Amino acid sequence: MIYDVKLPKHAPSPGILPFCGTNPAGHTLAANGRYLTYDGKPFFPVSGEFHFARYRREDWERELRKMKAGGVNIVATYIFWIHHEEEKGVFDFSDRRDLRAFVELCGKVGLGVILRIGPWCHGECRNGGFPDWIQFQTDFARRTDDP
């Protein structure tokens, strides 16, 4: 079987809505009528999920490199509240919970990051990622489906 692919001779038209942004490092993400561009070059984002707080910190780099080798260029990750404030008012961003170290490592490996900050998380996490102590709080109204 022979396939003939004909590419349009004209440049892609700008998108209907202006979509362009430049980050503090000077990199630009934009869209035209056909595709996304990153620093002016066509870009196809491929995202994979990695819940850093569920892995030993020493395993992060190896696993991220596997993802990159598989074609992933953006890592999405939840910030599970339940992992960072197990006890009310006591925050833990050490070891496997070190968000800053994880994001910096993603940059070192060459992966972008989408932070999924919640508070609700659909990552098979108890209480949807809310800390256990929150269910005993009485100083706020709880959301309900009741009329």
Language model: regions and residue ranges:
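Small/flexible residues
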Residues: 36, 118, 144-145
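N-terminal carbohydrate-binding accessory modules
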Residues: 1-74
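Aromatic-lined substrate-binding rim segments of carbohydrate-active enzymes
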Residues: 60-134
